[in-house]
């Protein structure tokens, strides 16, 4: 079981992942599906756990201009970028496995984080402390590829595992979306397993942006009922 060091994670945000998060087809679909799931909900304060450089919060602000944005991330470099890019936001460096903020937020989003954490149950318990109304989690499930291990994945969830852990952490699951079959997973993930993932990182020039955009539109043909990317919307259960 490999984990990525804090220093390596910070270096990734300094030089490797910014354009991938902005222009990469998978990251764009993550944001699209998150927005689709939360659109019917009522919320004002939003906490993005694992906020990175703020790309999700930028899009949420554009669609929901009245929200109050907050974010935490392990990387000081990512947090600095988020502070520069998200107007009116409050962003802090924090390890979700070691603590929580004192406040509660209407909506807590934790996207593509738990698969990196050896102690995901402690992270979920800390998320519970900060969730006022809704928690939305996205994570991979199914077979783990080698390039995902290189990105610091310590697990991909088995069927039913993530929802079970969420419920054991004091939440009631409201809805589940499974997405990605067949073009994202298995086809795109298997392609990256064979070719390596270097082409997805670093600066995106005009050609890479064009290719990424084409793949984004191909991914629109993926099933929203079947796939290895899972989105779970949950609400905290009142303490008895």
List each model region and its residues.
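Conserved N-terminal segment of class I S-adenosyl-L-methionine
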Residues: 1-107, 111, 121-124, 156-160, ...
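A short glycine-rich, Lys/Arg-flanked "PGG" loop and its adjoining helix->strand segment in the class I
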Residues: 121-135
């Amino acid at each position: 079981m490999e984990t990525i060091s804090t220093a390596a994670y910070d270096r990734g945000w300094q030089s490797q992942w910014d354009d991938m998060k902005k222009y990469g087809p998978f990251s764009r679909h993550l944001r699209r599906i998150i927005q689709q799931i939360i659109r019917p909900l009522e919320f004002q304060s939003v906490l993005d756990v694992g906020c990175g450089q703020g790309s999700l919060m930028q899009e949420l602000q554009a669609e929901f201009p009245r929200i109050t944005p907050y974010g935490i991330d392990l990387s000081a470099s990512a947090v600095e970028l988020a502070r520069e890019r998200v107007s009116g936001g409050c962003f802090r460096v924090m390890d979700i496995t070691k603590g929580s903020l004192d406040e509660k937020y209407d909506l807590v989003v934790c996207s593509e984080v738990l698969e990196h954490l050896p102690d995901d149950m402690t992270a979920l318990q800390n998320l519970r402390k900060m969730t006022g109304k809704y928690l939305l989690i996205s994570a991979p499930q199914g077979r783990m590829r080698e390039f995902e291990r290189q990105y610091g994945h310590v697990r991909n969830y088995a069927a039913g595992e993530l929802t079970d852990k969420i419920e054991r952490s004091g939440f009631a699951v409201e809805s589940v979306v499974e997405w990605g079959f067949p073009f994202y997973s298995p086809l795109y993930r298997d392609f990256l397993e064979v070719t390596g993932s270097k082409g997805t990182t670093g600066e995106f020039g005009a050609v890479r942006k064009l290719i990424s955009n084409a793949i984004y539109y191909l991914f629109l043909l993926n099933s929203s009922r079947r796939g290895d990317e899972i989105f779970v919307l949950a609400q905290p259960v009142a303490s008895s």
